[in-house]
Curated annotation (Swiss-Prot):
CDD domains: 7tmA_OR2B-like. Residues 1-26, 81-101, 160-196, 261-273 are extracellular. GO terms for molecular function: G protein-coupled receptor activity; olfactory receptor activity. This is Olfactory receptor 2J2. InterPro entries: GPCR_Rhodpsn (IPR000276), GPCR_Rhodpsn_7TM (IPR017452), Olfact_rcpt (IPR000725). Disulfide bonds join C98-C190. One of its GO terms (biological process) is detection of chemical stimulus involved in sensory perception of smell. It is a multi-pass membrane protein. Residues 51-58, 122-140, 221-237, 294-312 are cytoplasmic.
């Protein structure tokens, strides 16, 4: 049977997920649920703090709250479906559901790539052009940059996901993944998918390599500025904020590069599942910890919110 772009609403896919390791499904369910709850709690905590505490009404925390919201949405677009599949025999997803999931996973992933570039630019201006920071990072401009990240992500995803579902999928409907994503869907095709694979490589290069190059360029300039600093306190502050952002960048870009910067035909399905599991489950849960563990401003805001700060 052939599934085309005009498939009926009764069509469905079977998400194989981790069914090759049935003995691990219970363990995976518990571990993934814990990480998912950590993601929800940590990122909601940052969003609430950034909104209610006036001390955090700065460009850095505005972008951080946007990143937290992106992480929440990105994780929620795939993990609840995975948890349901791990705990029950029903592992299907409707054709429409698969389209929607693919669209949001791509959109939110691309938006996060762009937003991480914006955050690195914010740090560059703060360190390299501190006297012009309030002018260059005006609240209106910050809102425009954040909105641009979302618009770019959702626009490019609409084009790319449409191109993916135009490919005729035939035979079985077994998606060897735990969510609908491009390489896994292309493996179901009964036609030559080299054009789609090339498109995926080009899109990945544009929205993975170019943002990464821009981020590294910004931090190269920051490193030169830091080396010329005389103040030890200033050095420590820069290393704390920039080091946290670089760690988040590494946790996001390294697995994404391993996942998308090679043709789907050369990518091991099992390897791809665990790489995807890392950047959809582990990374979003660690980001709040990375940004807050040694951050005095966030700790102070948390104390004020919880009423733990005494007058001085």
């Amino acid at each position: 049977m052939m599934i085309k772009k005009n498939a009926s609403s009764e069509d469905f896919f079977i998400l194989l997920g981790f069914s090759n390791w049935p003995q691990l499904e219970v363990v995976l369910f518990v571990v993934i649920l814990i990480f998912y709850l950590m993601t929800l709690t940590g990122n909601l905590f940052i969003i609430i703090l950034s909104y209610v505490d006036s001390h955090l009404h700065t460009p850095m925390y505005f972008f951080l709250s946007n990143l937290s919201f992106l992480d929440l949405c990105h994780t929620t677009s795939s993990i609840p479906q995975l948890l349901v599949n791990l705990r029950g025999p029903e592992k299907t997803i409707s054709y429409a559901g698969c389209m929607v999931q693919l669209y949001f996973v791509l959109a939110l992933g691309i938006a996060e790539c762009v937003l991480l570039v914006v955050m690195s630019y914010d740090r560059y201006v703060a360190v390299c052009r501190p006297l012009h920071y309030t002018v260059l990072m005006h609240p209106r401009f910050c809102h425009l940059l954040a909105a641009a990240s979302w618009v770019i992500g959702f626009t490019i995803s609409a084009l790319h996901s449409s191109f993916t579902f135009w490919v005729p999928l035939c035979g079985h409907r077994l998606v060897d993944h735990f969510f609908c994503e491009v390489p896994a869907l292309l493996r179901l095709s009964c036609v030559d998918t080299h054009a789609n694979e090339l498109t995926l490589m080009v899109m990945s290069s544009i929205f993975v390599l170019i943002p990464l190059i821009l981020i590294l360029t910004a931090y190269g300039a920051i490193a030169r500025a830091v080396l010329s600093m005389q103040s030890t306190t200033g050095l420590q502050k820069v290393f704390r904020t920039c080091g946290a952002h670089l760690m988040v960048v590494s946790l996001f870009f390294i697995p994404v590069m391993c996942m998308y910067l090679q043709p789907p035909s050369e990518n091991s399905p099992d390897q791809g599942k665990f790489i995807a599991l890392f950047y959809t489950v582990v990374t979003p849960s660690l980001n709040p910890l990375i940004y807050t563990l040694r951050n005095k401003h966030v700790k102070g805001a948390a104390k004020r919110l919880l009423g733990w700060e005494w007058g001085k």
